[in-house]
Amino acid sequence: MTKSELIEKLADKLSHLSAKEVEKSIKEILELMAQSLSKGERIEIRGFGSFSLHYRAPRVGRNPKTGESVELSGKYVPHFKPGKELRERVNLSVA
């Protein structure tokens, strides 16, 4: 599901809100989440999961075109850990 599909489905379910209001709300939620993660804060949404940052240590990578070694610096990457409720729901519907 894309962001625009999410906005469309929410606007259909929440008929008292316009599509523009739903779009603005979704964008604001995502912006607040990005700001929290960029400050190193953990985001927990009970029943859904948590977002946090994981550190990737510096390493030597390879340029796929040339095969040449490339030094890659350490960095933080966003990580999502699904909650128990979400995992169970997904496993029920997929199985």
From Swiss-Prot:
Signal peptide: none annotated. Pfam families: Bac_DNA_binding. Transmembrane segments: none annotated. GO terms for cellular component: chromosome; cytosol. It comes from the Bacteria. Keywords: DNA recombination, DNA-binding, Transcription, Transcription regulation, Translation regulation. SMART domains: BHL. GO terms for biological process: DNA recombination; regulation of DNA-templated transcription; regulation of translation. GO terms for molecular function: DNA binding; structural constituent of chromatin. Belongs to the bacterial histone-like protein family. This protein is one of the two subunits of integration host factor, a specific DNA-binding protein that functions in genetic recombination as well as in transcriptional and translational control. NCBIfam families: hip, PRK00199.1. Heterodimer of an alpha and a beta chain. This is Integration host factor subunit beta. The gene is ihfB.
